[in-house]
């Protein structure tokens, strides 16, 4: 097939020759005359934005700076979730761990013993399990029948650590019964009047048959014989 046409000797910006689009007529092999645009082969370098070998990807928008970073090859790669989290943490460090809830506060209930009273009262083997409750400052009721601690009942009554161990009473009236740690062990003893009767830890152990309470008080008072 004959080809006639004009070719413009132009070059592109890189100096490569660019064939022009000429209009020519060609004589077909079978005598037909045809007209058409000359197929001047354009040569253009591959300058698409998606170039093989470089992988250039142009992005628009403000979020690209925070969600991607340069991969060193002219492109950008997606940041991982851990890297994003590290950037959002104060100072950009993600290796600071805050252990929450490691210092819990627990309360332990130990039963009904010593519930009603104040300052650590203990009731050990009373029938109700609430021995020496109304007394103050650490009274202990061990084996009394009641041990519930209304003033003047078993293992109560006295203040500042009075202890009633086995008898049904062992205390006496309110505010009596050996202030500051008097202990009544078996019977009706361990009582005494207010401010007397075994101050600072006197022990009343027997059944009250050896000496009367008033005799004991007189012996303890200064100047009394």
Curated annotation (Swiss-Prot):
Note the superkingdom of the native organism: Eukaryota
Residue span of region 5 X approximate tandem repeats: 105-199
Residue ranges, annotated region (Disordered): 1-78
Bias class Gly residues marks the residues at 21-39
Q: Does the keyword Repeat apply?
A: yes
Q: What triggers or suppresses the expression of this protein?
A: By abscisic acid (ABA) and water stress.
Q: Which parts of the chain are sequence repeats?
A: 105-118, 119-136, 137-159, 160-178, 179-199
The protein's matches in InterPro entries, at most eight in alphabetical order, are given as: Dehydrin (IPR000167), Dehydrin_CS (IPR030513)
Q: Which is one Gene Ontology cellular component term of this protein? A: cytosol
* Keywords of the record: Repeat, Stress response
A biological process term (GO) from this entry: response to water deprivation
Pfam families for the chain: Dehydrin
Q: Which family does it belong to?
A: Belongs to the plant dehydrin family.
The name on file for this protein is Dehydrin DHN4
Gene encoding it? DHN4
């Amino acid at each position: 097939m004959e080809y006639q046409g004009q070719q413009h000797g132009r070059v592109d910006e890189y100096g490569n020759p660019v064939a022009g689009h000429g209009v020519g007529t060609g004589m077909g092999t079978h005598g037909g005359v045809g007209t058409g645009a000359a197929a001047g082969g354009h040569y253009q370098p591959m300058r698409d934005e998606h170039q093989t070998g470089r992988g250039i990807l142009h992005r628009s928008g403000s979020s690209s700076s925070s969600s991607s970073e340069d991969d060193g090859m002219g492109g950008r790669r997606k940041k991982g979730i851990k890297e994003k989290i590290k950037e959002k943490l104060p100072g950009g460090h993600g290796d600071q761990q805050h252990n929450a809830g490691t210092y819990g506060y627990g309360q332990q209930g130990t039963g009904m013993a010593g519930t009603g009273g104040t300052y650590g009262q203990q009731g050990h083997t009373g029938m109700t399990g609430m021995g020496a409750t109304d007394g103050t400052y650490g009274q202990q009721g061990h084996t009394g029948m009641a041990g519930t601690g209304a003033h003047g009942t078993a293992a109560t009554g006295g203040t500042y650590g009075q202890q009633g161990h086995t008898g049904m009473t062992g205390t006496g009236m309110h505010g009596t019964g050996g202030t500051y740690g008097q202990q009544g062990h078996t019977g009706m003893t361990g009582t005494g009047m207010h401010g007397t009767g075994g101050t600072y830890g006197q022990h009343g152990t027997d059944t009250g048959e050896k000496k009367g309470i008033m005799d004991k008080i007189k012996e303890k008072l200064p100047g009394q014989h």
